[in-house]
Amino acid sequence: MTVGDPRGIGPEIVAKALADPQVGERCDIAVVGPEGAGISVDESVGRWVPSSDAALAGRLSGLAIERAVEMALAGAVDGIVTAPIDKAALHAGGYDFPGHTEMLGSLTRSRVAMMLASDKLRVVLATTHIPLSRVIEALTTESIVEAARITRDGLRDWFGIAEPRIALCALNPHGGDSGRFGNEDTELLAPAASAAGIAGPFPADTIFVRALRGEFDAVIAPYHDVGMTAIKVASFGSAVNITLGLPFPRTSPDHGTALDIAGQDRADPSSMIAATLLCSSFALRARQPGGRQGYGDRPTESRSAARPSRAQ
């Protein structure tokens, strides 16, 4: 379990998760982070003043992620739960990644996808942390087919769904309305969905309602905010971020660093606890006879942590 950005609420929600009875019963946890984060459930850490050095915080966040991945690839731990990081601080600290998902994919040389999941809804993002102006160029038949493959494998391996029902959310209003509002849905998304063997594309204003009613096991959203809005409206505070495609389970809470309330004992640990318990359930599933440690038969060298790209 990484503490995330030590200036934020990460250390607090980690400490609260460690103190949770369910977590204590189900998990043995190694905390990875700077000693100064003061994680303790047995004694007071006394008075402290959070650092304002964003670059240092980002550097420490990145080092913790690197170390956690090394431990997971070596088999020292069964999975990783990550507390929130500050993306700008991560970059200032020398790590040229938009966030956890991309960094984890690079470190493990894996093709990954971001899933947000709750007991009501599962959403996978076909594109993640890019400007809206770049979404159309980033969406390709290959990227959608790959997102569907990773989603299908994740639903089978981690959630135990033998025949996953996956749908693709449309890009344009009303799915383009026969080309009146754009041709991408008919010319790109529909052929890609057919090639991937998934349903859709269906308009965003109905697809998530259908998924909430149980028609689909997961929805692939074409861009970040349409998917994030749906999951957070449905399950704010209880959803879990999952990186699909890694050779080990990785989860995190569905919120950010909340720098404005750090150190005030106001942080709600619910999502962190949910992330920890879900990671534990994935790890237990992988240990069962026939369980899989990850997603496919990648070469042996892909199991060794790669050195991440650094910002200049």
Q: Where is each model-derived feature located?
A:
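Contiguous, glycine/small-aliphatic-enriched amphipathic segments in soluble metabolic enzymes
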Residues: 1-100, 138, 142-222, 226-251, ...
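Short N-terminal helix-initiation segments at or just after the protein's N-terminus
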Residues: 66-68, 110-115
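A glycine-rich helix N-cap at a beta->alpha junction
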Residues: 101-110
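Conserved hydrophobic/aromatic beta-strand scaffold that supports enzyme active sites
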Residues: 103, 114, 123-125, 248-250
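Short secondary-structure boundary/capping segments
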Residues: 104-105, 115-116, 158
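Ligand-binding beta-strand-loop-alpha-helix segment within the catalytic cores
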Residues: 116-146
